[in-house]
Amino acid sequence: MEAKNNRILKDKTFDKSRWIQMPRDVIAGHDALLQLPNVITDLGVTGPLLLLSGKTTLQTVGLEVLRLLEDRQVTSAVVGEITYEEIARVEDLAQNIGAVLIIAVGGGRVIDTAKVVSYNLDIQFISVPTAASHDGIASSRASIMTADGNVSVAAHPPLAIVADTGIIAGAPHRLMAAGYADMVANYTAVMDWDLSKSKTGEQVSEYAMTLSMITAELMVENAEKIKAFDENAAWIVVKALFASGVAMSIAGSSRPASGGEHKFAHMLERLVPGKVLHGEACGVGTIISMIMHEGDWKKIRNSLRLIGAPTTPKDLGISDEIVIEAILRAKEIRPERYTIFDEDITREQAECLVARLYEE
């Protein structure tokens, strides 16, 4: 018998492969920002650095970063709304100074800008979140504003994360509550992924699904602690945001943390731009999705109420009609991603879903 016929694994019996990119260093906790110089040294980075931040943050945390890195060549820049034009401007700046590393100090807008620029120029970046408002601090996806609304694009995950819980706890409580809601959304994101598996045959990652679900469960179990909005609360939420980002890296997509509730949220943000925080919209979308999945939606609703997150259109400061429209049009967002919002939902059903949000 020829040797080739003695192979234990025959040709094409297994053809799966995946390149998983995750942060190399994660520093989180009290005074974590002071470790930033050590993190950069540990990464072996030498050369010009580009510090990106928001206008206000640059004058506070940004100045502290510049002080900590005073022995390095650092250029700072304020970033605006994350648009393709703004990304191009930052890319030009990074290339002009020969940046070898980007340090993103701020919220989701700043970090997403760094992600995309990092990806396009093939240089790494460090995420230094100043708020825990959504899981973008650790993920490999970014949201870009366009004339037709936000679009999600592939990007680099951070090479390192430096999350100072003192700084994060000092942010407005509304931001941490939004981050909590974004994590609770993992419940229905996983349900939708499983639904798509049965409806369309989509491949799933059991590891990513499990990690994502555990993250959501830990949020609900710790809601009483998180509602204090202190450093311990920031510690719990930041770890969950990081775990959710890891789940997405394992999956190679945002699937384990983004289902129909996110499609609903993106449509809501398109209908009333600037009116609601992303995490807040996801929280309401999660309740609606859980009702459709016939799950324990009141458990989700009650946990969101406990930490002061919106649970109704009235809480969001928008009309019921807008939410009804967002339910009906959610399937326009990423139509290739099947979720329960892609089922045939009538206007009457959408109206009933919104009415149930006000139930006790």
Swiss-Prot record:
Keyword Coiled coil tagged: no
Pathway(s) annotated for this protein in UniProt: Membrane lipid metabolism; glycerophospholipid metabolism
Catalytic reaction equation(s): sn-glycerol 1-phosphate + NAD(+) = dihydroxyacetone phosphate + NADH + H(+); sn-glycerol 1-phosphate + NADP(+) = dihydroxyacetone phosphate + NADPH + H(+)
Assigned keywords, A-Z: Cytoplasm, Lipid biosynthesis, Lipid metabolism, Metal-binding, NAD, NADP, Oxidoreductase, Phospholipid biosynthesis, Phospholipid metabolism, Zinc
Leading EC class: oxidoreductase
Cofactor field: Zn(2+)
Sections of the chain in a coiled coil: none
Annotated substrate binding sites: D135, D182, H266
Record InterPro entries: G1P_dehydrogenase_arc, G1PDH, Glycerol_DH
Location in or out of the cell: Cytoplasm
A GO cellular component annotation in the UniProt record: cytoplasm
Physiological role: Catalyzes the NAD(P)H-dependent reduction of dihydroxyacetonephosphate (DHAP or glycerone phosphate) to glycerol 1-phosphate (G1P). The G1P thus generated is used as the glycerophosphate backbone of phospholipids in the cellular membranes of Archaea.
Protein name (database record): Glycerol-1-phosphate dehydrogenase [NAD(P)+]
Species the sequence originates in: Methanocorpusculum labreanum (strain ATCC 43576 / DSM 4855 / Z)
